[in-house]
Every structure is written in C-alpha cells, then in structure tokens.
C-alpha cells in the first residue's frame, strides 16, 4: 500500500518536472522571489511570523546544515539511478559532480565570510556607536558578545538556490525511467529530494521577505545560479568533466 502511494506521488512529480518550463524557469524564479521579497520587506508589508525568527525549526535543522542534507540524499540517488541506467564506471564518474559542487559551495561561502570580515567592524551593540577595534573578524567579535557590521552577502540565498538547481539537474534520470522499472528505494529517494527542494524554495522566500538587504540577496542568488550554470550548462557538457546525468536520448 505504502509503495503504491509513493509510486503515485512519484508519477505526479515526474509529470511536473517533465514540463520544460519547470526546469527552465526555476533559476528565474529565484531572482523574482529575491526582488519581490525585498520590495515587500522594505515596504514592511509582510507581518512578523514564526519564520521571521532564525530559531524556527526549518532553519535550525535544515537550512543551517542544508549542504549536508543535499549531499546525504543526492549521494545514494546519483549512485543508484546512474548505475541502474548505465554502469558502475558511469555512476562513479557522475558522483564526482558532488565533489565539484562541494568545492563550489566551500569557495563561495568562505569568500562571503572573508568579504564580511574585511569590510566590517566590531561594535559593542547594534546601535554601532562604540567600536571595538581589538576584534578584526566577525567570529571573534561575536564570540566576545559584541555586534559585527560588514557587507553580508546572503549565504542562505546562495546555498538554497544552488542546492535546488543541483538537485533539479540530478533528478533528471527519473523523468525517463519507466514506472515498471522503478523500485521503492529509488522512489523514496526521489520523494525526499522533492521535499527538500520544496523546503529550500520556501526558506528562500522567507529569507527574501525577512532578512538581508536586496543587494546581499541578489549577489548570493547570482552566485548560486552562476555556480550551477558554469558546471551543468558549460563544463559538464564537455568530455573531460563529471558529465551530465543520463538524458532522454540515452534511454532506450
């Protein structure tokens, strides 16, 4: 019974993702959410809610470790779906895309931290009247109980858009596997990935309407989209790369 319900949900999700506009317009959706959310935030049109606090459950247990969730779910899905369709060697090659994605995530987040450190100052409080010059990094300042003010590119906007787009690309094999050849483990992984994407998009929207300035969010979102584009649309189509997930023409 449970397997039948899962299979039915997978069929509906596959139909959704098969629509060309779903995958084509997802990057545009993130930009639109950032812009509209920022306008709403500046106009103070969105009331405070549970999600306006950074202590909400989704932020604490999902977004704060978002890359961990992405890797934990994508690793078995890529291995299983790519091996199921192609071969061991193809699956191993495709798994290197997770190493590349992790490198992109690490470089971008560390760069954001560095920029915030070199552009910021430590203050005794958020009134930013008394400066504490003995602290030259955000980490040291915050550890001492003070307030750091620097150019804070939105890491949430980056990681949530980037993770969603990477997952979108890696779920492509499910669009072309006939239902008769699927199995419960693969269906469950696919459902979990779709749930995670839904959470990422929702929390991306919450970030847009409750946190950061517009430039912080646009830069973070741009980095996420650029990281996805330069890998999946530029590098992975070339021979010496992790390659793309199995595409429609590869399924016979």
From Swiss-Prot:
Class of the enzyme per the UniProt entry, highest EC level: hydrolase
Entry-linked InterPro entries: FIT, FITM1/2
HAMAP family with a match to the protein in the record: FITM2
Protein family: Belongs to the FIT family. FIT2 subfamily.
Record EC number: 3.6.1.-
A cellular component annotation (GO) from this entry: endoplasmic reticulum membrane
Species of origin: Danio rerio (Zebrafish)
Pfam family, one: FIT
GO BP terms: cytoskeleton organization; endocrine pancreas development; fatty-acyl-CoA catabolic process; glucose homeostasis; lipid droplet formation; lipid droplet organization; lipid homeostasis; lipid storage
Cytoplasmic topological intervals: 1-25, 81-94, 178-190, 245-252
Residue ranges annotated as Lumenal topological domain: 47-59, 116-156, 212-223
Function summary: Fatty acyl-coenzyme A (CoA) diphosphatase that hydrolyzes fatty acyl-CoA to yield acyl-4'-phosphopantetheine and adenosine 3',5'-bisphosphate. Preferentially hydrolyzes unsaturated long-chain acyl-CoA substrates in the endoplasmic reticulum (ER) lumen. This catalytic activity is required for maintaining ER structure and for lipid droplets (LDs) biogenesis, which are lipid storage organelles involved in maintaining lipid and energy homeostasis. Required for lipid droplet accumulation in liver and intestine during embryogenesis.
Domain of life: Eukaryota
Tissue-wise expression: Widely expressed.
Places the protein is found: Endoplasmic reticulum membrane
Transmembrane segments: 26-46, 60-80, 95-115, 157-177, 191-211, 224-244
This protein's name: Acyl-coenzyme A diphosphatase FITM2
Membrane topology recorded in Swiss-Prot or TrEMBL: Multi-pass membrane protein
Reaction(s) catalysed by this chain's protein: an acyl-CoA + H2O = an acyl-4'-phosphopantetheine + adenosine 3',5'-bisphosphate + 2 H(+)
Keywords, comma-separated and alphabetical: Endoplasmic reticulum, Hydrolase, Lipid metabolism, Membrane, Transmembrane, Transmembrane helix
Main location: endoplasmic reticulum
Active site residues according to the UniProt entry: 156, 212
One function term, GO molecular function aspect: coenzyme A diphosphatase activity
């Amino acid at each position: 019974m449970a397997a039948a319900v899962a299979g039915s949900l997978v069929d509906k999700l596959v139909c959704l993702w098969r629509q060309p506009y779903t995958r084509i317009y997802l990057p545009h959706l993130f930009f639109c959410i950032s812009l509209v959310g920022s306008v709403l935030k500046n106009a103070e049109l969105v009331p405070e809610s549970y999600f306006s606090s950074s202590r909400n459950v989704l932020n604490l247990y999902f977004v704060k470790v978002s890359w961990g969730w992405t890797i934990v779910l994508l690793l078995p899905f890529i291995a299983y779906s790519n091996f199921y369709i192609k071969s061991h060697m193809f699956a191993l090659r495709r798994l290197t895309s997770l190493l590349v994605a992790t490198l992109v995530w690490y470089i971008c987040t560390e760069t954001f931290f560095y920029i915030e450190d070199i552009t910021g100052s430590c203050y005794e409080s958020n009134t930013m009247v008394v400066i504490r010059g003995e602290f030259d990094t955000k980490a040291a300042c915050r550890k001492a109980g003070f307030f750091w003010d620097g150019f804070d590119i939105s890491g949430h906007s980056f990681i949530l858009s980037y993770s969603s787009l990477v997952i979108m690309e890696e779920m492509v094999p499910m669009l072309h596997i006939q239902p008769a050849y699927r199995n419960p483990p693969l269906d469950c992984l696919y459902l979990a990935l779709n749930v995670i994407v839904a959470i990422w998009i929702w929390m991306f929207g919450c970030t847009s309407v409750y946190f950061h300035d517009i430039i912080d969010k646009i830069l973070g979102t741009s980095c996420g989209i650029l990281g996805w584009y330069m890998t999946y649309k530029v590098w992975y189509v070339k021979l010496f790369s992790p390659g793309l997930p199995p595409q429609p023409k590869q399924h016979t």
